[in-house]
Amino acid sequence: MKVAVLGAAGGIGQALALLLKTQLPSGSELSLYDIAPVTPGVAVDLSHIPTAVKIKGFSGEDATPALEGADVVLISAGVARKPGMDRSDLFNVNAGIVKNLVQQVAKTCPKACIGIITNPVNTTVAIAAEVLKKAGVYDKNKLFGVTTLDIIRSNTFVAELKGKQPGEVEVPVIGGHSGVTILPLLSQVPGVSFTEQEVADLTKRIQNAGTEVVEAKAGGGSATLSMGQAAARFGLSLVRALQGEQGVIECAYVEGDGQYARFFSQPLLLGKNGVEERKSIGTLSAFEQNALEGMLDTLKKDIALGEEFVNK
Protein backbone atom coordinates (compact mmCIF):
# COMPACT_ATOMS: atom_id res chain seq x y z
CA MET A 1 0.00 0.00 0.00
CA LYS A 2 1.48 3.33 -1.04
CA VAL A 3 0.37 6.60 0.53
CA ALA A 4 1.46 9.98 -0.87
CA VAL A 5 1.27 13.20 1.15
CA LEU A 6 1.25 16.36 -0.99
CA GLY A 7 2.16 19.44 1.03
CA ALA A 8 4.36 17.32 3.28
CA ALA A 9 6.69 20.12 4.42
CA GLY A 10 3.88 22.19 5.96
CA GLY A 11 2.61 22.08 9.53
CA ILE A 12 -0.15 19.59 8.79
CA GLY A 13 1.94 17.61 6.32
CA GLN A 14 4.85 17.02 8.69
CA ALA A 15 2.56 15.97 11.57
CA LEU A 16 0.63 13.69 9.21
CA ALA A 17 3.83 12.17 7.80
CA LEU A 18 5.13 11.44 11.31
CA LEU A 19 1.90 9.70 12.32
CA LEU A 20 1.77 7.67 9.08
CA LYS A 21 5.43 6.63 9.45
CA THR A 22 4.69 5.29 12.93
CA GLN A 23 1.23 3.81 12.25
CA LEU A 24 0.94 2.55 8.66
CA PRO A 25 0.90 -1.25 8.35
CA SER A 26 4.33 -2.92 7.96
CA GLY A 27 5.45 -3.04 4.35
CA SER A 28 3.66 0.18 3.39
CA GLU A 29 5.35 2.92 1.39
CA LEU A 30 5.10 6.58 2.28
CA SER A 31 5.90 9.22 -0.27
CA LEU A 32 6.28 12.90 0.66
CA TYR A 33 6.00 15.78 -1.80
CA ASP A 34 6.13 19.54 -1.39
CA ILE A 35 7.32 22.44 -3.49
CA ALA A 36 9.69 23.33 -0.61
CA PRO A 37 13.31 22.13 -1.00
CA VAL A 38 13.34 20.79 2.58
CA THR A 39 11.01 17.88 1.70
CA PRO A 40 13.60 15.18 0.91
CA GLY A 41 15.17 16.10 4.26
CA VAL A 42 11.87 15.64 6.08
CA ALA A 43 11.79 12.12 4.62
CA VAL A 44 15.39 11.44 5.71
CA ASP A 45 14.53 12.69 9.21
CA LEU A 46 11.49 10.38 9.41
CA SER A 47 13.44 7.47 7.87
CA HIS A 48 15.42 7.19 11.13
CA ILE A 49 12.27 6.10 12.99
CA PRO A 50 12.39 2.29 13.28
CA THR A 51 9.18 1.16 11.60
CA ALA A 52 8.71 -1.08 8.56
CA VAL A 53 7.42 1.79 6.43
CA LYS A 54 9.61 2.86 3.49
CA ILE A 55 9.76 6.61 3.02
CA LYS A 56 10.95 8.93 0.24
CA GLY A 57 10.70 12.68 -0.24
CA PHE A 58 10.45 14.79 -3.40
CA SER A 59 10.44 18.53 -3.98
CA GLY A 60 10.04 20.96 -6.88
CA GLU A 61 7.22 21.71 -9.30
CA ASP A 62 6.61 18.12 -10.41
CA ALA A 63 4.83 15.73 -8.04
CA THR A 64 4.93 12.82 -10.52
CA PRO A 65 7.71 10.77 -8.87
CA ALA A 66 5.90 10.94 -5.53
CA LEU A 67 2.59 9.89 -7.08
CA GLU A 68 3.71 6.89 -9.14
CA GLY A 69 1.82 3.80 -7.94
CA ALA A 70 0.05 5.62 -5.08
CA ASP A 71 -3.10 3.98 -3.66
CA VAL A 72 -4.00 6.90 -1.40
CA VAL A 73 -3.14 10.58 -1.95
CA LEU A 74 -3.63 13.05 0.91
CA ILE A 75 -3.44 16.72 -0.13
CA SER A 76 -2.65 19.29 2.57
CA ALA A 77 -0.74 21.79 0.42
CA GLY A 78 -1.76 25.44 0.65
CA VAL A 79 -1.59 28.52 2.84
CA ALA A 80 -2.88 28.56 6.43
CA ARG A 81 -5.41 30.85 8.06
CA LYS A 82 -4.26 33.96 9.93
CA PRO A 83 -6.29 35.87 12.54
CA GLY A 84 -9.22 37.71 10.96
CA MET A 85 -9.36 35.33 7.99
CA ASP A 86 -12.01 32.70 7.55
CA ARG A 87 -11.56 29.53 5.53
CA SER A 88 -13.00 31.16 2.40
CA ASP A 89 -10.30 33.88 2.42
CA LEU A 90 -7.89 31.07 1.61
CA PHE A 91 -9.76 30.31 -1.58
CA ASN A 92 -7.82 32.50 -3.98
CA VAL A 93 -4.46 30.89 -3.26
CA ASN A 94 -5.47 27.35 -2.39
CA ALA A 95 -7.86 26.81 -5.32
CA GLY A 96 -4.98 27.05 -7.80
CA ILE A 97 -2.75 24.76 -5.74
CA VAL A 98 -5.42 22.03 -5.48
CA LYS A 99 -6.28 22.29 -9.17
CA ASN A 100 -2.64 21.86 -10.18
CA LEU A 101 -1.96 18.92 -7.85
CA VAL A 102 -5.16 17.07 -8.75
CA GLN A 103 -4.29 17.45 -12.46
CA GLN A 104 -1.02 15.65 -11.67
CA VAL A 105 -2.88 12.92 -9.73
CA ALA A 106 -5.28 12.46 -12.67
CA LYS A 107 -2.30 11.91 -14.96
CA THR A 108 -0.08 9.74 -12.75
CA CYS A 109 -2.32 7.67 -10.42
CA PRO A 110 -5.92 8.14 -11.64
CA LYS A 111 -7.22 5.15 -9.66
CA ALA A 112 -5.95 6.40 -6.28
CA CYS A 113 -8.27 7.45 -3.46
CA ILE A 114 -7.81 11.17 -2.82
CA GLY A 115 -8.31 12.90 0.53
CA ILE A 116 -8.51 16.69 0.33
CA ILE A 117 -7.39 18.49 3.49
CA THR A 118 -6.62 21.89 1.95
CA ASN A 119 -9.17 24.51 2.97
CA PRO A 120 -11.77 25.67 2.13
CA VAL A 121 -12.71 21.96 1.84
CA ASN A 122 -16.34 22.71 0.85
CA THR A 123 -14.92 24.30 -2.30
CA THR A 124 -11.59 22.52 -2.94
CA VAL A 125 -13.33 19.11 -3.18
CA ALA A 126 -15.61 20.50 -5.90
CA ILE A 127 -12.50 21.79 -7.71
CA ALA A 128 -10.88 18.34 -7.48
CA ALA A 129 -14.03 16.63 -8.79
CA GLU A 130 -14.27 18.93 -11.81
CA VAL A 131 -10.56 18.51 -12.62
CA LEU A 132 -10.87 14.71 -12.45
CA LYS A 133 -14.05 14.84 -14.54
CA LYS A 134 -12.30 16.91 -17.24
CA ALA A 135 -9.51 14.33 -17.29
CA GLY A 136 -12.11 11.54 -17.68
CA VAL A 137 -11.03 9.74 -14.49
CA TYR A 138 -13.54 10.92 -11.87
CA ASP A 139 -14.85 8.24 -9.51
CA LYS A 140 -17.06 9.73 -6.80
CA ASN A 141 -16.31 6.79 -4.53
CA LYS A 142 -12.63 7.75 -4.44
CA LEU A 143 -12.71 11.48 -3.69
CA PHE A 144 -13.05 12.63 -0.08
CA GLY A 145 -13.01 15.91 1.77
CA VAL A 146 -11.34 15.13 5.09
CA THR A 147 -13.68 16.47 7.79
CA THR A 148 -12.34 14.19 10.54
CA LEU A 149 -11.10 17.18 12.56
CA ASP A 150 -14.72 18.16 13.20
CA ILE A 151 -15.39 14.66 14.53
CA ILE A 152 -12.36 14.46 16.83
CA ARG A 153 -13.07 17.95 18.18
CA SER A 154 -16.69 16.98 18.84
CA ASN A 155 -15.56 13.82 20.63
CA THR A 156 -13.11 15.81 22.78
CA PHE A 157 -15.53 18.59 23.72
CA VAL A 158 -18.40 16.20 24.52
CA ALA A 159 -16.12 13.97 26.63
CA GLU A 160 -14.85 17.04 28.54
CA LEU A 161 -18.35 18.36 29.18
CA LYS A 162 -19.79 15.02 30.26
CA GLY A 163 -16.81 13.54 32.12
CA LYS A 164 -16.43 10.64 29.66
CA GLN A 165 -13.28 9.01 28.30
CA PRO A 166 -12.66 10.67 24.89
CA GLY A 167 -12.14 7.24 23.31
CA GLU A 168 -15.67 6.14 24.14
CA VAL A 169 -17.44 9.08 22.47
CA GLU A 170 -18.11 9.14 18.71
CA VAL A 171 -20.11 12.08 17.37
CA PRO A 172 -21.28 11.92 13.73
CA VAL A 173 -20.74 15.28 12.00
CA ILE A 174 -22.58 16.05 8.77
CA GLY A 175 -22.76 18.89 6.23
CA GLY A 176 -19.56 20.64 5.28
CA HIS A 177 -16.28 21.75 6.84
CA SER A 178 -16.63 25.41 7.73
CA GLY A 179 -18.72 27.57 10.03
CA VAL A 180 -22.46 26.91 9.95
CA THR A 181 -22.05 24.00 7.51
CA ILE A 182 -20.47 21.91 10.31
CA LEU A 183 -23.32 20.05 12.03
CA PRO A 184 -22.52 17.68 14.91
CA LEU A 185 -25.39 15.25 15.50
CA LEU A 186 -25.29 15.45 19.29
CA SER A 187 -28.72 13.79 19.52
CA GLN A 188 -27.14 10.58 18.17
CA VAL A 189 -24.41 10.17 20.80
CA PRO A 190 -25.37 7.01 22.75
CA GLY A 191 -25.69 7.27 26.53
CA VAL A 192 -25.31 11.05 26.69
CA SER A 193 -28.03 13.67 26.94
CA PHE A 194 -27.73 17.44 26.60
CA THR A 195 -29.83 20.44 27.56
CA GLU A 196 -30.90 22.74 24.72
CA GLN A 197 -28.35 25.31 25.92
CA GLU A 198 -25.55 22.72 25.91
CA VAL A 199 -26.45 21.71 22.35
CA ALA A 200 -26.41 25.34 21.18
CA ASP A 201 -23.10 26.10 22.95
CA LEU A 202 -21.34 22.88 21.89
CA THR A 203 -22.46 23.23 18.28
CA LYS A 204 -21.11 26.77 18.18
CA ARG A 205 -17.84 25.77 19.81
CA ILE A 206 -17.34 22.92 17.33
CA GLN A 207 -18.12 25.23 14.40
CA ASN A 208 -15.68 27.86 15.66
CA ALA A 209 -12.94 25.57 17.00
CA GLY A 210 -10.60 26.39 14.11
CA THR A 211 -10.84 30.08 14.94
CA GLU A 212 -10.14 29.25 18.61
CA VAL A 213 -6.78 27.77 17.54
CA VAL A 214 -5.95 30.56 15.05
CA GLU A 215 -6.53 33.18 17.76
CA ALA A 216 -4.64 31.22 20.43
CA LYS A 217 -1.62 30.92 18.11
CA ALA A 218 -1.73 34.73 17.76
CA GLY A 219 -0.72 34.92 14.12
CA GLY A 220 1.66 31.98 14.37
CA GLY A 221 -0.50 29.52 12.44
CA SER A 222 -3.68 27.49 12.45
CA ALA A 223 -4.67 23.99 13.60
CA THR A 224 -1.85 21.82 12.27
CA LEU A 225 -1.23 19.12 14.89
CA SER A 226 -4.86 18.18 15.57
CA MET A 227 -5.49 18.31 11.81
CA GLY A 228 -2.48 16.04 11.26
CA GLN A 229 -3.97 13.56 13.74
CA ALA A 230 -7.41 13.81 12.09
CA ALA A 231 -5.97 13.26 8.61
CA ALA A 232 -3.93 10.31 9.86
CA ARG A 233 -7.03 8.74 11.41
CA PHE A 234 -8.89 9.10 8.12
CA GLY A 235 -5.95 7.93 5.98
CA LEU A 236 -5.31 4.88 8.17
CA SER A 237 -9.02 3.94 8.13
CA LEU A 238 -8.99 4.18 4.34
CA VAL A 239 -5.87 1.99 4.12
CA ARG A 240 -7.44 -0.65 6.38
CA ALA A 241 -10.61 -0.68 4.27
CA LEU A 242 -8.65 -0.86 0.99
CA GLN A 243 -6.79 -3.86 2.41
CA GLY A 244 -10.10 -5.63 3.02
CA GLU A 245 -10.95 -4.87 6.65
CA GLN A 246 -14.74 -4.99 7.11
CA GLY A 247 -16.92 -2.47 8.91
CA VAL A 248 -14.69 0.61 8.66
CA ILE A 249 -16.91 3.68 9.05
CA GLU A 250 -15.78 7.32 8.87
CA CYS A 251 -17.58 10.58 8.15
CA ALA A 252 -16.22 12.47 5.14
CA TYR A 253 -17.35 15.03 2.56
CA VAL A 254 -18.26 13.21 -0.66
CA GLU A 255 -20.49 13.43 -3.70
CA GLY A 256 -23.70 11.58 -2.89
CA ASP A 257 -27.23 11.45 -4.24
CA GLY A 258 -27.60 15.23 -4.09
CA GLN A 259 -30.46 15.09 -1.58
CA TYR A 260 -28.98 18.00 0.39
CA ALA A 261 -26.17 19.30 -1.82
CA ARG A 262 -23.92 17.79 -4.50
CA PHE A 263 -21.22 17.23 -1.85
CA PHE A 264 -22.14 16.42 1.72
CA SER A 265 -20.36 15.00 4.74
CA GLN A 266 -22.01 11.90 6.14
CA PRO A 267 -21.07 8.53 7.66
CA LEU A 268 -19.51 6.24 5.05
CA LEU A 269 -18.79 2.53 5.01
CA LEU A 270 -15.33 2.28 3.43
CA GLY A 271 -14.20 -0.69 1.37
CA LYS A 272 -11.83 -1.95 -1.32
CA ASN A 273 -13.05 0.64 -3.83
CA GLY A 274 -13.25 3.63 -1.51
CA VAL A 275 -16.84 4.39 -0.53
CA GLU A 276 -18.74 1.12 -0.23
CA GLU A 277 -21.94 2.69 1.07
CA ARG A 278 -23.18 6.18 1.97
CA LYS A 279 -24.99 5.64 5.25
CA SER A 280 -28.17 7.43 6.29
CA ILE A 281 -27.78 10.48 8.54
CA GLY A 282 -30.54 8.99 10.71
CA THR A 283 -33.18 10.87 12.65
CA LEU A 284 -32.33 14.48 13.50
CA SER A 285 -33.54 16.54 16.44
CA ALA A 286 -35.57 19.69 15.70
CA PHE A 287 -32.44 21.81 16.39
CA GLU A 288 -30.38 19.70 13.94
CA GLN A 289 -33.09 19.70 11.26
CA ASN A 290 -33.31 23.47 11.49
CA ALA A 291 -29.51 23.85 11.34
CA LEU A 292 -29.36 21.52 8.33
CA GLU A 293 -31.94 23.51 6.39
CA GLY A 294 -30.23 26.76 7.37
CA MET A 295 -26.79 25.75 6.09
CA LEU A 296 -27.66 24.41 2.65
CA ASP A 297 -27.54 27.72 0.79
CA THR A 298 -24.06 28.43 2.15
CA LEU A 299 -22.87 24.92 1.29
CA LYS A 300 -24.29 25.08 -2.25
CA LYS A 301 -22.61 28.45 -2.86
CA ASP A 302 -19.28 27.07 -1.66
CA ILE A 303 -19.63 24.14 -4.08
CA ALA A 304 -20.65 26.35 -7.03
CA LEU A 305 -17.57 28.52 -6.42
CA GLY A 306 -15.33 25.47 -6.92
CA GLU A 307 -17.18 24.25 -10.01
CA GLU A 308 -16.96 27.70 -11.60
CA PHE A 309 -13.25 28.00 -10.79
CA VAL A 310 -12.48 24.98 -13.01
CA ASN A 311 -15.10 25.56 -15.71
CA LYS A 312 -14.87 29.33 -16.19
Curated annotation (Swiss-Prot):
**Which GO molecular-function terms appear in the entry?**
L-malate dehydrogenase (NAD+) activity
Q: Which reaction does it catalyse?
A: (S)-malate + NAD(+) = oxaloacetate + NADH + H(+)
Read off the PROSITE patterns from this record. Answer: MDH
Catalytic residues (positions) = 177 (proton acceptor)
Where is NAD(+) bound in this sequence? 7-13, 34, 94, 117-119, 227
Task: Report if keyword Transferase is assigned.
Answer: no
* The EC number(s) this enzyme carries: 1.1.1.37
Q: Which SUPFAM superfamilies match?
A: LDH C-terminal domain-like (SSF56327), NAD(P)-binding Rossmann-fold domains (SSF51735)
Does Oxidoreductase show up as a keyword for this record? yes
Biological process according to GO: malate metabolic process; tricarboxylic acid cycle
> What GO cellular component is one of the record's annotations?
cytoplasm
> Where would you find the membrane-spanning parts of this chain?
none
InterPro entries the UniProt entry points to: L-lactate/malate_DH (IPR001557), Lactate/malate_DH_C (IPR022383), Lactate/malate_DH_N (IPR001236), Lactate_DH/Glyco_Ohase_4_C (IPR015955), Malate_DH_AS (IPR001252), Malate_DH_type1 (IPR010097), Malate_DH_type1_bac (IPR023958), NAD(P)-bd_dom_sf (IPR036291)
Which residues make up the binding site for substrate?
Answer: 81, 87, 119, 153
HAMAP family from the entry? Malate_dehydrog_1
The record's section on PANTHER family has:
MALATE AND LACTATE DEHYDROGENASE, MALATE DEHYDROGENASE, MITOCHONDRIAL
What is the role of this chain? Catalyzes the reversible oxidation of malate to oxaloacetate.
Its family? Belongs to the LDH/MDH superfamily. MDH type 1 family.
Q: What is this protein called?
A: Malate dehydrogenase
